[in-house]
């Protein structure tokens, strides 16, 4: 299926509505808190220079970003426990230098009810404040938003992590290792300057063993490239 035809199936087609999702507003937003795990797989060589606030390995960047909410509460009545979000993104040059913007698309967990769907779009759209309000400033174009079955898995010992939307996105990685890596230990970076989930984090590095995208007008396949897993803990507004 072509990207053009596929866009006909997304929930929100009008680009102005997609962009409106990422316009900052925190009026009448309830208190919220979510925590869980995030990872990406990307086009860059290992380790991805973007995590160190540098330009991508090959000049441009293509990636899958996946979030799993272990614990989440939006307002007094809406639990977000166990829900997933998946993003696709591309850009050219250093995203942290302020001279480029991300072209993106987002999928939200189809098992979310109406209240949960609204909360997810508020939080991940940056309209509910918190870290994602800052992250949203990096986005220049939204190609589409949709709800889909998102499978997210991460090993307890961080030996592997993966996310999948059947027929659209596959992102699987294994923990980076080498001859000097002690058994069971992980290769980590403390306080990465280009962290995608906020300051003060710990990134665990991995190698993408499967990275394939054909959705929302994005199409690529990059195996054997960079990946990283980072826990997140956000509050708002």
Indicate residue ranges for each PLM-predicted region.
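Cationic, low-complexity basic patches in intrinsically disordered or flexible, solvent-exposed regions
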Residues: 7
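N-terminal ordered "arm"
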Residues: 27-74
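Structured domain cores in non-transmembrane regions
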Residues: 69-137
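Charged linear interaction tracts used for macromolecular binding and regulation
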Residues: 108-181
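Extended, charged low-complexity segments
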Residues: 176-237
């Amino acid at each position: 299926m072509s990207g053009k035809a596929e866009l006909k199936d997304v929930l929100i087609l009008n680009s102005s509505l997609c962009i409106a999702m990422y316009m900052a507003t925190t009026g009448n937003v309830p208190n919220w808190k979510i925590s869980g795990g995030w990872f990406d797989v990307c086009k860059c060589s290992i380790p991805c220079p973007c995590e160190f606030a540098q330009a991508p390995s090959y000049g441009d960047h293509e990636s899958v970003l996946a979030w799993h909410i272990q614990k989440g509460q939006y307002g007094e009545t809406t639990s977000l426990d166990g829900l997933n979000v998946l993003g696709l993104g591309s850009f050219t040059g250093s995203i942290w230098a302020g001279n480029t913007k991300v072209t993106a698309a987002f999928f939200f967990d189809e098992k979310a009810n109406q209240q949960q769907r609204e909360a997810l779009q508020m939080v991940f759209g940056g309209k509910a404040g918190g870290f994602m309000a800052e992250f949203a400033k990096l986005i220049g174009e939204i190609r589409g938003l949709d709800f889909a079955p998102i499978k997210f898995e991460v090993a307890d010992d961080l030996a592997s992590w993966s996310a999948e939307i059947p027929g659209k996105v596959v992102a699987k990685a294994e923990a980076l290792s080498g001859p000097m890596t002690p058994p069971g230990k992980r290769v980590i970076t403390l306080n990465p300057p280009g962290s995608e989930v906020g300051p003060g984090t710990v990134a665990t590095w991995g190698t993408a063993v499967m990275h394939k995208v054909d959705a929302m007008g994005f199409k690529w396949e990059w195996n054997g490239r960079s990946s990283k897993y980072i826990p997140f803990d956000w509050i708002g507004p």
